[in-house]
Regions:
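Short secondary-structure junctions and interdomain/linker hinges
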Residues: 11, 28-32, 75, 143-147, ...
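Internal, well-ordered alpha-helical segments in soluble enzyme and binding-protein domains
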Residues: 17, 64-67, 132
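Extended mid-to-C-terminal alpha-helical interaction segments
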Residues: 92, 99-188
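DNA-contacting interfaces and partner/effector-binding or oligomerization modules
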Residues: 32-33, 37-121
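Short hinge/gating elements
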Residues: 2-8, 50-54, 121-122, 140-143
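Short capping loops/turns at secondary-structure boundaries
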Residues: 7-10, 14, 53-61, 78, ...
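N-terminal low-complexity or simple alpha-helical regulatory segments
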Residues: 1-42
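Short, highly charged low-complexity linear segments
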Residues: 14-15, 37-39, 77-88, 123-132, ...
Length: 188
């Protein structure tokens, strides 16, 4: 996930990582968002959709919450079974066949969320690096500013060039950051 993934892995602890991901999730998807809440002894990552996604809704929530669970396990070293996932939809027909590979999951709940012990929030991350976390967060800020600045392609390119420090990116790099091919960028 580019600088966002690098930044998340480099944060000092899980709480910082979740807050960084929460702030910049729009760099990866505009369909979903999530927020961190505390309820008693539990930390809760509540997921929501920003747009109607129709038939993809269940798939998107499954993908997001299972990905966050696996990522959290990877960066902390905690067991994937240390928490539980809640979904607001009925148990899918395939669940029993994959249940043994997944963390505890509860269906027909009020919200789509990942729940785990609050104490995990302060746990140091395996790959914590404050310098890398700062640099990655700064790059994410630049990417977000670029994304929000305009839908006008020439304006986005100018903004991107003005944010560079000491060099100009190649055409392919600019196109990649704008999520298009170099050929499409030239036409626009």
């Amino acid at each position: 996930h580019g600088f966002l993934g690098y930044g998340v892995m480099s944060c000092a602890n899980l709480e910082e990582a979740i807050k960084l991901a929460q702030r910049f999730v729009r760099l990866r998807t505009v369909l979903m968002s999530f927020k961190l809440e505390i309820e008693g002894d539990f930390a809760i990552v509540v997921a929501s959709s920003n747009y109607p996604v129709g038939l993809l809704r269940q798939f998107i929530f499954e993908s997001l919450l299972l990905s966050l669970t696996r990522a959290g396990s990877f960066i902390t070293g905690n067991s994937i079974n240390a928490g539980e996932i809640h979904f607001d939809f009925a148990e899918p027909v395939y669940y029993q066949s994959v249940k043994h590979k997944l963390p505890p999951i509860l269906f027909n709940k009020e919200a789509n969320q990942l729940r785990f012990p609050k104490a995990f929030l302060s746990q140091p991350l395996i790959m914590a690096d404050p310098v890398a976390a700062k640099l990655a967060a700064e790059q994410c800020e630049r990417e977000l500013a670029l994304m929000e600045s305009s839908t006008d392609i020439p304006a986005q390119v100018r903004a991107m060039l003005s944010h560079q420090q000491g060099y100009y990116p190649q055409l392919e790099q600019v196109a990649d950051r704008l999520f298009m091919s170099s050929r499409t960028l030239k036409r626009r």
